[in-house]
Amino acid sequence: RQRQMCIRDRLYQMGLNGTETILIHSSMKAIGDVEGGAETVLDAWMEYFKEGLLLLPTHTWKTVNESHPVFDSQKEPSCVGVLTNLFMKREGVVRSLHPTHSMAGFGKHAAEYLAGEEYRNTPCTPGGCYDRLKDAGGKILLVGVGHERNTYIHSVEEVLNVPNRLSDKPVKLTVVWPQGQRDVYMRKHYNPDQPHISEDFVKLTQAYTDCGAAKNTVLGSADCILCDAAKVFDVTRHVLAPEPECLVTRERIEKERWADYISVSYTHLR
């Protein structure tokens, strides 16, 4: 059985020093048997990143919609895993007010980082919590999941204005928090040919690895991917530039799409 110290040691071995701004997408099942279960995992993460900013997604897109248009930040459960639900209830953790793609944070400037999400009108609006990861020198750790769960790539597509990613018609939703409420007109993820856009993000897995934007690692029994947000943005922009919709329209992305990126990066490093 894994212990809290083992988890912290693994984070250190990944090259993380605890002062990072880091977003973690996770599968508790993939992590495996931990002494104390999910609470121990959270204890380890919160202790390790107490001098940084620890972020977990607390999405509600599965439940907050036309038939249930109210997002109560204090009550609405997350639809993206047990760790996210336990995390957002912990003392010192702040949850953003985005009605469908909220995020919870713990650590330095968490409230400041998460502020203003009730004014967003798309899932990962430019200038929002996801987009600003790249400007914060942020990392993304995928624990037991792949890039199909890497919400940050949605934000990259929004910044790049990739066509056919959002619904034309917004949905009226109401955000409720202890100090008030606000109506929001939210566009949703939508593509006429691919109902689950993020499933195609895995087509960029090799590109991210080859270009130094991501590296494979492990945490417990879980295969993990540690990403650099700014580099993920750059590589995605480079690959999509000639053909913005290629993730959906092509079965696979050929290596030629990023070979010149590696060449330019290597020349720059020299």
Which residue ranges define each predicted feature?
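Conserved small/polar residues in nucleotide/adenosyl-binding loops
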Residues: 2-9, 267-270
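A conditional alpha-helix N-cap/helix-loop micro-motif detector
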Residues: 4, 38, 122-123
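Glycine-rich phosphate/diphosphate-binding loops that line cofactor/substrate pockets in enzymes
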Residues: 12-21, 133-135
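N-terminal active-site beta-alpha-beta segment that forms phosphate/nucleotide-binding
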Residues: 17-67
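Structural alpha-beta junctions
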Residues: 47-53, 89-95, 162-172
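Internal, conserved structured core segments that host functional sites
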Residues: 65-154
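Glycine-rich, aromatic-bearing surface loops/beta-hairpins
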Residues: 114-217
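Acidic/aromatic/glycine-rich contiguous surface patches that form carbohydrate-binding/processing clefts
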Residues: 190-269
